[in-house]
Amino acid sequence: MELTQNPSVLELVQKTAELTTPKEIVWIDGSEAQLESLRKIAVETGELIKLNEEKLPGCYLNRSDVNDVARVEGRTFICSRTREEAGPTNNWMDPDEMKAKLHEILRCAMAGRTMYVIPYSMGVIGSPFAKYGIEVTDSIYVVLNMAIMTRIGTKVLDALGDSSDVILGVHSKVTLDPENRYIVHFPEENKIISVNSNYGGNVLQGKKCFSLRIASVLGRREAVSYTHLRAH
């Protein structure tokens, strides 16, 4: 059941589901009951190991795949419209070429899996400084860590309303194939796509992807807009 009627969010969820074909879609409402249910599922599947409750209450262990233990600079791209816009220290690929590549990787990537829709806020929800995002993922690890690192759930969607001012993100573990691992940013579209990784720095999109890379573009864009307004 959708938790919002926001057109941008619904379009992201629909298009991602059509491409990745998950068995079900779960919207993250931010409740402790839902998060605890996901922890139990992750323990049952072996994705999480619950630690000694007396010594480390409420703590879990997650082990990364041996080939997926760090950020990958060579697989991180800024797909702006022009190479110059990406900057001299970043990897660049034509946006259309990269999208075609990612679509093939994501095709049926979530078959048999659950797709989670995470509404999150960078900053206090409702603050004029808050920035909102949506991350669609097939990883419980991502859901649980985004709940720790950001503010998540229905309150974010309520604050967002029908606004299109939102960062849209897609993530899938796919097969964790390092040869097809990509962390990609489309700054003009406010969009992030990461595939074939389940490592924090690559897949917790509010962290490096949004608050470092996309936010630097937003800062420049908003500063230019503000300067333009003052000039007139």
Located regions from the model:
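N-terminal-proximal low-complexity accessory segments that begin disordered
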Residues: T4-S37, V43
